[in-house]
Amino acid sequence: MYAIITGASSGCGYEYARVMASNGYDLLIVSNEDIIHDKAALLRQEYPVTILSLVRNLGVQEAAKELYDYCHTNAIEVEVLINNAGVYHDRDFLEDTEAFNQLILNLHMYTPAMLMYYFGNDMVKRGKGYVLNMCSITADIAVQRLSTYGATKAFLQNFTRSVHVEWKNQGVYVTNVTPGAINTGLYNIRPWLTKMGLALGYIVEPDYLARRGVKAMLKGRAKVSIPGIWNTILLFLVALVPTGLLRLIRNWGIF
C-alpha cells in the first residue's frame, strides 16, 4: 500500500516521507520541483520500500484529478494521503498578484479537498485509509499580512474536522495537524527569536512534527496541535491583546 505525500521535496514533507517509509509504506512523493527525484534517490538508500517521485504543480485546479488518474493508471493503491504542499506569505492582500492568490487558494483548499474526494472514495469503499492535512495555528488568528494564508488554513481546518466525523465510522481517519512555528526557514522570524523559540520548544524541528503528526494520524486522532501547550498559550494571549499592539508585534517579526 502507498502513502502519497505532497510538497515532499523539503521541510516537513520530506520528513513525512521518511516517517512513512520507516513505517513500511511504499511512497509516491510529489513536488513542483525537479529535485524531488534526487530526494527519492536518497530515500531509497535509507529505506527498503518502493519510492516513486512525481513532478506536479498542485496549484492548478486540474492537478488533483491528474494525480488520481496517474495512480489509477499505474495501479498505485493509496492507503495514506498527506496533504502537505503549501506556500507561506507575509504580505498585505493587495500586494499579492492575481496569479499568487489563485495559487494559494488552489494549493491550500481546492487541491487538498479534491484529492480527498478522489482518494477518499477508494478508501471508504475499501474500509480503511488515513488522511493528514497540514493546517496552521493561523487558522485561529486573524492578523494583517496573513489574511489569505490564515483564511485558507481555516477552511482546511474546518473541512478536516467535518470529514473526520463523516468518515471515521467507515474506517477512514482524517487528522488535522496544527503547528505553530516550524524551523524550516519559511517564516520571517528574527534569528535570536528562532534560537530562543527552539530552546523553549515554541518552534519545533520538522522531523519532530512529522513523527508526532503521523503517530496521531495512525491512531485515528482528529487533531494534534504541535507544540500543544505553546499553541494554547498563544491563542489565549492573542485574544487578549489589542489589535494595535498585535500589529506592532507582527511588525517586530515575533510571529
Specify the residue positions occupied by each region the protein language model found.
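SDR active-site lid
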Residues: 166-229
